[in-house]
Amino acid sequence: GSPVTQEEYNKIVETQLTELWSNYGKLFEIWFDGGVLSQQNGGADILTLIQRLQPNSIAFQGPYGYPNLIRWVGNEEGNSPYPCWATADATTSADGVQKIKGLYGNPHGNYWCPGEADFTLRRNDSFQGGWFWRANEDHLIFSTDELLLKYETSVGRNTNMLLGLVIDKNGLVPDADVK
C-alpha cells in the first residue's frame, strides 16, 4: 500500500477510538502502550475524545491534561520501586516517555499520577513474554506464593497491580490460569 500522512493516520486513530469508546460501555482503564503523541506535536486529538466518551476511565500513559492518569513503573515484573509516590511531575505523566529518574514519582509533584505495575500470570520465558497464549506452557504459571510476592511489591508499594492473562485459541482464559 501507499504511506498515509499524519493527518490521515490521526483520522484513522480518532475513528477507531470513537468506535471502541462508544460501543462497549464504561471502560475502567484505557491503555496507551508507549504513551500518546500530543496534538501539539502532530498527534490525534485523544484528550478531547477521552474527555467526551470515557471521562471516568483511568488512562495508562494517557494524554497530558487528562486528570485520571497512571504511569509505568519501569518493568513488567510487578516490582515497583520503593518508595513509589502517587504524585509526579510532567516528565513522568505527560508523554509516555518514562525517564528513569521519574520511576519513583515525585513526593512534591504537581500531578496525581500513581504508578501501575504490570506483569503476566505466566513467566517471561513463555511465548511473547507471557502476554500471549501458546499450548503446553501451563507449567510457566506463577505459583500462589510468587503471586503474593508480586502483590506485595506492587500494591504494597503504592501502585496499581495489573495482571496480564492470556486468551487461548477458544477465546477463553485457560482453566490452568483460572486455578
Predicted regions and their residues:
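Mature catalytic domains of secreted/periplasmic carbohydrate-active enzymes
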Residues: G1-K179
